[in-house]
Amino acid sequence: RVGDALLTPGWTTYRHRIQYQTYDVTDLLRNGENALGALLGDGWYRGHLGFQRQRNMYGDRLALLLQLQIRYADGRTELVTSDSNWKASNRGPIRMNDLYWGEEYDARLEKEGWDQAGFNDADWQAVRKLDHAKSIVVAQVAPNVVRHEEIRPQRIFQSPNGQTILDFGQNMVGWVRLKVSGPAGATVTLTHAEV
């Protein structure tokens, strides 16, 4: 994971402005071969948005624009950029994601080492380079959304219909982290609510 920013990039009017973020990845680089990988989600661009909860308000295709600038000890620099030589897969464990409607995650589809050098991507598809107006690509100016604290449930109980309820004792913005075990194909459903 690069950085501590969450839900990036933030909302913007994508037809007029696309914000980029910068990160120092020096501590993540290793001697020998390295790999760059990214997970893309629907976010504000393609997810449900607005009072009508319309999808694809700005477009229906996800895209990644990436540039890695390497400065060697001897002063040389090298650029690694996302281009049509990259590959992508939509067969990973995240089956659906939406800022309002949550995420469907199928652990049976996890790809061990997908973000490591030497991963066999033979069954991945080639990506297509998209043209865009470079004038609308700007640095992010707003502060990042970051985690501020971890809150534990104040009460865990069963509802009359057998659902497990975690009461955090306050309104909050966030998500639940949990460990589960069970047979392959078992389903766990988390629903967040303000009660």
Report each predicted region and the residues it spans:
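Extracellular/oxidizing-compartment recognition motifs
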Residues: 1-195
